[in-house]
């Protein structure tokens, strides 16, 4: 199915499972160590870690990455559709090397030949940071989006970057 592994930060006993939560009675003694993810392929490790998308559906990232793109491309939606949000832009400005490393892993796992960052023109610092970080990455490009709302919506991003109507 489309499920994903779920982890807890507390050792204990599961005492109740409801539609929207899992109740754990914590052990009196909590261990400091964590249970490591078993070594394996990058895709297997993403699946084992229970990584999910940040959208409301929590779609399993392993399912997305498990698609063989056969030399296709990945779109990175950094448009920040909602006017008050800045988390994507902040990640690019502060952790650009890690973001690009994640994109390269995603390309490797999914067999993508190219990746495109979709980002609004108004985010000049993030755009400049990306340009500098990508100067030696010919397979990863930047597509500047217009500064209009709701330009972060996925169909609008696909239309703007690829000229495809979904």
Language model features with spans:
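Generic structural motif
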Residues: 1, 6-16
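Gly-rich Lys/Arg/Thr-decorated short loops/hinges at beta-loop-alpha junctions or inter-strand turns
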Residues: 74-88
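Short amphipathic alpha-helices and their capping/turn segments at secondary-structure boundaries
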Residues: 57-71
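Hydrophobic alpha-helical positions that pack around
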Residues: 113-166
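Glycine- and charge-enriched low-complexity intrinsically disordered segments
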Residues: 18-49
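Short coil/turn connectors at secondary-structure junctions
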Residues: 19-20, 42, 48-49, 69-72, ...
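Generic secondary-structure signature for well-ordered alpha-helical cores
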Residues: 47-51, 56, 79-80, 104-112, ...
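Histidine-anchored nucleotide/phosphate-binding helix
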Residues: 93-109
């Amino acid at each position: 199915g489309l499920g994903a592994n779920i982890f807890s930060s507390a050792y204990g006993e599961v005492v109740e499972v409801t539609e929207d939560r899992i109740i754990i009675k914590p052990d009196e003694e909590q261990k400091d160590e964590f249970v490591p993810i078993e070594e394996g392929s990058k895709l297997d490790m993403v699946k084992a870690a229970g990584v999910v998308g940040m959208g409301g559906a929590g779609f399993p990232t392993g399912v997305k990455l498990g698609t063989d793109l056969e030399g296709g491309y990945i779109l990175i939606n950094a448009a920040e559709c909602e006017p008050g949000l800045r988390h994507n832009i902040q990640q690019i400005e502060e952790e650009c090397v890690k973001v690009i490393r994640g994109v390269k892993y995603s390309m490797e796992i999914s067999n993508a030949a190219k990746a495109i960052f979709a980002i609004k023109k108004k985010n000049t610092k993030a755009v400049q940071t990306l340009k500098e970080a990508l100067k030696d990455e010919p397979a990863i490009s930047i597509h500047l989006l217009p500064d209009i709302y709701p330009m972060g919506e996925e169909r609008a991003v696909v239309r703007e970057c690829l000229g495809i109507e979904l």
